[in-house]
Amino acid sequence: MPILPGMYSAVTEIAAADPDSALEHFERLFSFETDCWDVHAAIEAGHSDFVLLDVRSPEAYAAAHVPTAINLPHGRINEHNLAQFPSEKLFVVYCSGPQCNGADRAAVRLARMGRKVKKMIGGVEGWRDEGFSFATQEQLS
């Protein structure tokens, strides 16, 4: 259906937030998310100020994962499995990509346990799209 002059497109049918609200919203996102570039830069610089969790299956992790990541599927996140990490440590979680809600499920579990958490947006797909290399289970052996 063509857009007639004076009609709104689906983009503008709902008004955009005012700039102050938009600023508050987008600034808050940085408290919840990080991206593949920032994680890669931190790994390359040798930073250890966060724990990177691959929350996919052990099989997916073994095939390819982000270097330095620890495999802990989101369904296995519990106090016992986190006991080795200081309570103030930040966790950065990722899964397959935008089509997967495993990272969100992991973030909910961690937050419910009082742990600090961010999601690495893009997940494995984002990491691959940026051209970053992966580690495999064979490399760990």
Residue spans of the language-model regions?
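Alpha-helical scaffolding within the catalytic cores
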Residues: 76-81
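Short loop/helix-cap segments at secondary-structure boundaries that form the rim of catalytic
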Residues: 61-67, 127
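Short beta->alpha connector loops at strand-helix junctions that form conserved
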Residues: 72-75, 121, 138
